[in-house]
Protein backbone atom coordinates (compact mmCIF):
# COMPACT_ATOMS: atom_id res chain seq x y z
CA UNK A 1 0.00 0.00 0.00
CA UNK A 2 1.29 3.42 -0.94
CA UNK A 3 0.77 6.23 1.53
CA UNK A 4 1.49 9.96 1.63
CA UNK A 5 0.24 13.19 3.18
CA UNK A 6 -1.75 15.68 1.14
CA UNK A 7 -1.94 19.14 2.68
CA UNK A 8 -4.52 21.65 1.52
CA UNK A 9 -5.96 24.74 3.19
CA UNK A 10 -3.93 24.02 6.31
CA UNK A 11 -5.34 20.49 6.71
CA UNK A 12 -3.22 17.35 6.37
CA UNK A 13 -4.89 14.25 4.92
CA UNK A 14 -3.44 10.75 4.93
CA UNK A 15 -3.80 9.32 1.41
CA UNK A 16 -3.60 5.58 0.82
CA UNK A 17 -3.63 3.89 -2.59
CA UNK A 18 -3.76 0.14 -3.19
CA UNK A 19 -5.79 -2.68 -4.73
CA UNK A 20 -9.01 -3.22 -2.78
CA UNK A 21 -7.67 -6.50 -1.36
CA UNK A 22 -5.14 -4.50 0.67
CA UNK A 23 -8.03 -2.64 2.33
CA UNK A 24 -9.75 -5.92 3.33
CA UNK A 25 -9.96 -5.03 7.03
CA UNK A 26 -11.45 -1.63 6.16
CA UNK A 27 -13.88 -2.52 3.37
CA UNK A 28 -16.90 -2.26 5.68
CA UNK A 29 -15.82 1.24 6.80
CA UNK A 30 -15.25 2.27 3.18
CA UNK A 31 -18.68 0.93 2.24
CA UNK A 32 -20.29 2.69 5.21
CA UNK A 33 -18.75 5.93 3.92
CA UNK A 34 -19.82 5.37 0.29
CA UNK A 35 -23.35 4.01 0.71
CA UNK A 36 -25.08 7.24 1.81
CA UNK A 37 -23.22 9.25 -0.85
CA UNK A 38 -23.57 6.87 -3.81
CA UNK A 39 -25.81 7.19 -6.83
CA UNK A 40 -25.99 3.40 -7.15
CA UNK A 41 -27.69 0.74 -5.10
CA UNK A 42 -25.87 -0.65 -2.07
CA UNK A 43 -25.72 -4.15 -3.60
CA UNK A 44 -23.52 -2.84 -6.42
CA UNK A 45 -21.15 -1.17 -3.98
CA UNK A 46 -20.94 -4.32 -1.86
CA UNK A 47 -20.22 -6.40 -4.95
CA UNK A 48 -17.71 -4.14 -6.72
CA UNK A 49 -15.80 -2.09 -4.13
CA UNK A 50 -14.03 -5.17 -2.67
CA UNK A 51 -12.95 -6.09 -6.23
CA UNK A 52 -11.66 -2.66 -7.25
CA UNK A 53 -8.37 -2.66 -9.13
CA UNK A 54 -7.31 0.43 -7.15
CA UNK A 55 -8.81 2.30 -4.20
CA UNK A 56 -7.64 5.75 -3.15
CA UNK A 57 -8.74 6.73 0.36
CA UNK A 58 -8.26 10.01 2.22
CA UNK A 59 -8.37 10.03 6.02
CA UNK A 60 -8.59 13.04 8.32
CA UNK A 61 -8.07 12.60 12.05
CA UNK A 62 -8.63 8.85 11.68
CA UNK A 63 -11.89 9.07 9.71
CA UNK A 64 -12.43 8.34 6.02
CA UNK A 65 -13.37 11.59 4.28
CA UNK A 66 -12.93 10.81 0.57
CA UNK A 67 -12.79 7.72 -1.66
CA UNK A 68 -12.27 7.04 -5.35
CA UNK A 69 -11.98 3.70 -7.15
CA UNK A 70 -10.78 2.20 -10.37
CA UNK A 71 -13.42 -0.51 -10.74
CA UNK A 72 -12.68 -3.95 -12.07
CA UNK A 73 -13.64 -4.74 -15.65
CA UNK A 74 -17.35 -5.57 -15.80
CA UNK A 75 -18.47 -6.66 -19.27
CA UNK A 76 -22.19 -6.63 -18.42
CA UNK A 77 -22.05 -3.06 -17.08
CA UNK A 78 -19.84 -1.90 -19.96
CA UNK A 79 -22.29 -3.32 -22.48
CA UNK A 80 -25.14 -1.51 -20.72
CA UNK A 81 -23.16 1.76 -20.87
CA UNK A 82 -22.36 1.12 -24.54
CA UNK A 83 -26.03 0.54 -25.35
CA UNK A 84 -27.30 3.49 -23.28
CA UNK A 85 -24.74 5.97 -24.61
CA UNK A 86 -24.72 4.80 -28.21
CA UNK A 87 -20.92 4.99 -28.10
CA UNK A 88 -18.82 1.95 -29.20
CA UNK A 89 -17.23 1.52 -25.77
CA UNK A 90 -14.80 -1.43 -25.61
CA UNK A 91 -16.08 -3.94 -23.06
CA UNK A 92 -12.72 -4.59 -21.42
CA UNK A 93 -12.05 -1.13 -19.94
CA UNK A 94 -11.85 -0.33 -16.24
CA UNK A 95 -14.12 2.40 -14.90
CA UNK A 96 -13.14 5.30 -12.68
CA UNK A 97 -15.89 5.74 -10.14
CA UNK A 98 -17.36 5.56 -6.66
CA UNK A 99 -15.93 9.02 -6.03
CA UNK A 100 -17.28 10.64 -2.88
CA UNK A 101 -16.15 13.26 -0.38
CA UNK A 102 -17.51 14.08 3.06
CA UNK A 103 -19.52 17.28 2.84
CA UNK A 104 -17.38 18.94 5.54
CA UNK A 105 -14.32 18.52 3.30
CA UNK A 106 -15.73 19.89 0.03
CA UNK A 107 -13.58 22.45 -1.80
CA UNK A 108 -10.26 21.03 -0.60
CA UNK A 109 -9.26 19.30 -3.85
CA UNK A 110 -9.55 15.81 -2.34
CA UNK A 111 -11.53 14.39 -5.27
CA UNK A 112 -9.07 15.86 -7.71
CA UNK A 113 -6.09 14.48 -5.80
CA UNK A 114 -7.58 10.98 -5.49
CA UNK A 115 -8.50 10.95 -9.19
CA UNK A 116 -4.92 11.94 -10.03
CA UNK A 117 -3.53 9.13 -7.87
CA UNK A 118 -5.64 6.58 -9.70
CA UNK A 119 -4.93 8.03 -13.16
CA UNK A 120 -1.20 7.58 -12.52
CA UNK A 121 -1.89 3.84 -12.21
CA UNK A 122 -4.09 3.36 -15.29
CA UNK A 123 -2.58 1.46 -18.18
CA UNK A 124 -4.52 2.09 -21.37
CA UNK A 125 -8.03 3.46 -21.80
CA UNK A 126 -10.60 3.93 -19.05
CA UNK A 127 -14.08 5.37 -18.74
CA UNK A 128 -16.30 7.06 -16.20
CA UNK A 129 -20.03 7.53 -15.95
CA UNK A 130 -20.95 10.83 -14.32
CA UNK A 131 -24.23 12.30 -13.23
CA UNK A 132 -24.98 15.23 -15.55
CA UNK A 133 -24.65 18.46 -13.58
CA UNK A 134 -22.06 17.09 -11.12
CA UNK A 135 -19.83 20.05 -11.90
CA UNK A 136 -16.99 19.12 -9.56
CA UNK A 137 -16.65 15.58 -10.89
CA UNK A 138 -16.98 16.70 -14.51
CA UNK A 139 -14.20 19.25 -13.91
CA UNK A 140 -11.98 16.65 -12.20
CA UNK A 141 -12.25 14.06 -14.92
CA UNK A 142 -11.85 16.64 -17.67
CA UNK A 143 -8.55 17.66 -16.02
CA UNK A 144 -7.58 13.99 -16.17
CA UNK A 145 -8.11 14.00 -19.95
CA UNK A 146 -11.50 12.27 -20.04
CA UNK A 147 -13.80 13.51 -22.83
CA UNK A 148 -17.59 13.19 -23.06
CA UNK A 149 -18.74 10.59 -25.57
CA UNK A 150 -22.07 9.42 -26.92
CA UNK A 151 -25.45 10.59 -25.66
CA UNK A 152 -26.70 11.03 -22.11
CA UNK A 153 -29.28 8.62 -20.71
CA UNK A 154 -31.88 8.62 -17.97
CA UNK A 155 -31.60 6.89 -14.58
CA UNK A 156 -33.57 6.97 -11.34
CA UNK A 157 -31.82 7.33 -7.98
CA UNK A 158 -32.56 5.29 -4.85
CA UNK A 159 -35.23 7.82 -3.85
CA UNK A 160 -37.02 7.55 -7.20
CA UNK A 161 -35.75 10.89 -8.53
CA UNK A 162 -34.79 10.93 -12.23
CA UNK A 163 -31.40 12.14 -13.41
CA UNK A 164 -29.10 11.79 -16.42
CA UNK A 165 -25.77 10.04 -16.84
CA UNK A 166 -22.99 10.87 -19.29
CA UNK A 167 -20.15 8.68 -20.52
CA UNK A 168 -16.59 10.05 -20.39
CA UNK A 169 -13.64 8.21 -21.97
CA UNK A 170 -9.89 8.58 -21.43
CA UNK A 171 -7.70 7.60 -24.40
CA UNK A 172 -4.80 5.21 -23.92
CA UNK A 173 -2.34 7.87 -25.12
CA UNK A 174 -3.61 10.60 -22.77
CA UNK A 175 -0.96 12.24 -20.58
CA UNK A 176 -0.36 10.37 -17.30
CA UNK A 177 -0.96 13.50 -15.23
CA UNK A 178 -4.13 15.49 -14.65
CA UNK A 179 -3.17 18.80 -16.21
CA UNK A 180 -5.99 19.23 -18.71
CA UNK A 181 -7.89 22.48 -18.94
CA UNK A 182 -11.06 22.08 -16.85
CA UNK A 183 -13.12 24.24 -19.22
CA UNK A 184 -11.95 22.83 -22.55
CA UNK A 185 -12.38 19.45 -24.13
CA UNK A 186 -8.98 17.80 -24.48
Q: Residues of each region from the PLM?
A:
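Short amphipathic alpha-helix that is part of the acyltransferase structural core
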Residues: 2-43, 59-60
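Active-site rim helix/loop that mediates acceptor-substrate recognition in acyltransferases
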Residues: 32-69, 74-76
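Conserved acyl-donor/pantetheine-binding loop and adjacent beta-alpha core of acyl/acetyltransferases
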Residues: 63-98, 106, 155-160
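Residue-level recognition of the GNAT/N-acetyltransferase active site
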Residues: 97, 102, 131
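Conserved acetyl-CoA-binding loop-helix of GNAT-fold acetyltransferases
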Residues: 101, 106-120, 139, 143
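Conserved GNAT acetyl-CoA-binding A-motif
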Residues: 120-133
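Conserved active-site alpha-helix within GNAT-family acetyltransferase domains
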Residues: 132-154
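C-terminal "cap" of GNAT-fold acetyltransferases
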Residues: 154-186
Amino acid sequence: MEEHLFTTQGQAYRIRIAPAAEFATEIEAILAFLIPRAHVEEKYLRNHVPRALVLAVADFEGAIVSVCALKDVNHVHSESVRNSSGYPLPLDLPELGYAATNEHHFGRQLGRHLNEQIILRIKGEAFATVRVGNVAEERNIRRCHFCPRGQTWDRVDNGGKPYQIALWVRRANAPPICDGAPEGVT
